[in-house]
């Protein structure tokens, strides 16, 4: 999987394919808040996302408070966003929709 930093146009294209994700301040990360009906659903989402992240060897910055999960994705080694961030974001969206 490519860990090459994406340019502005590639980032805009990637965001156009992702519901509810936003470019974080500074433009080097994307962020989304997921809200579930309860803690069990939030934790189940995090478990599925963690397994996908491990498989991709790409790990999110996230916090969980009760039924809310805030996620920030960036590729620290590349100093910005890469294809991995968008791939993991798409997987997270799919898991949240289940």
UniProtKB/Swiss-Prot annotation:
Keyword Repeat carried by entry: no
Annotated EC: 4.2.1.96
Reaction(s) this enzyme catalyzes, per UniProt: (4aS,6R)-4a-hydroxy-L-erythro-5,6,7,8-tetrahydrobiopterin = (6R)-L-erythro-6,7-dihydrobiopterin + H2O
Gene Ontology biological process terms from the UniProt entry: tetrahydrobiopterin biosynthetic process
Molecular-function GO term, any one: 4-alpha-hydroxytetrahydrobiopterin dehydratase activity
Sorted UniProt keywords: Lyase
Highest taxon, organism lineage: Bacteria
Coiled-coil spans in chain: none
Database matches in InterPro entries: PCD_sf, Pterin_deHydtase
NCBIfam families: PRK00823.1-2 (NF002017), PRK00823.1-3 (NF002018)
Family statement: Belongs to the pterin-4-alpha-carbinolamine dehydratase family.
Name of the protein in its database record: Putative pterin-4-alpha-carbinolamine dehydratase
């Amino acid at each position: 999987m490519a860990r090459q930093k994406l340019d502005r146009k590639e980032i805009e294209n990637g965001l156009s394919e992702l519901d509810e994700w936003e470019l974080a301040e500074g433009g080097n990360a994307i962020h989304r808040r997921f809200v579930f009906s309860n803690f069990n659903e939030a934790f189940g989402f995090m478990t599925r996302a963690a397994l996908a992240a491990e498989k991709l060897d790409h790990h999110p910055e996230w916090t969980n408070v009760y039924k809310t999960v805030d996620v920030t994705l960036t590729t620290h080694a590349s100093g910005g966003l890469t294809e991995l961030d968008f791939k993991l974001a798409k997987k997270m969206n799919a898991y949240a929709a289940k």
